[in-house]
């Protein structure tokens, strides 16, 4: 009986060791990245760290609406796209931009465009952020670029530290939580901070930086314009006085509600083609 138990324990220990080894390889080799929810984030992240062999005219970074307009998986003649989703926030967009600039210092684009739905600018980390933002970005690599306001917001997410545990990070698991409702009308504190950082990074490299809106459902016109006006009245953001934001607001456009399958995303047949041509000046 003791011999049987001894063999059983050895088998269990060996099986556990093999399982842990496989899990470690699965995590550290990044095999999970194209299998979890939000794999588009890891695709954009990997692409942002990849060396290019030519100079692109435009680098596009944006949310899931931008992903519909300019998929990151597609090759373009003079455009490179790092579009993914809004859950990584403007902070995540900045991290992608910074990665690209550090990886390709000799092939910086002429222009960086953040192609962003106006509602995305309200994101100050959300209930999706544990999975979509913390897992890829809350680590030593990006910590030096995390502002105090972003760090404070991260610490409001319950069990935020769990996001870096390998078997959690390599899964689609997300802590179930809620966050305090926003106290701002439109531009969140995180969006404000990281739009400025993005603009300053581009300026330091003599690269143009532009913020361009994707179309909004016509039946949400009053909703977004009221939020913008309230933001202006409340002087919520110091960016509102800059040309970059004033131009962005003036470019906000609307499409028939029938063109959308949800609050922000286009039906496949109604996705605008070559959307940025109208802003190519």
Language-model features, listed with the residues they occupy:
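Hydrophobic membrane-insertion alpha-helices, especially the h-region
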Residues: 7-30
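Membrane-embedded segments
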Residues: 65-145
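C-terminal regions of proteins
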Residues: 231-232, 237-281
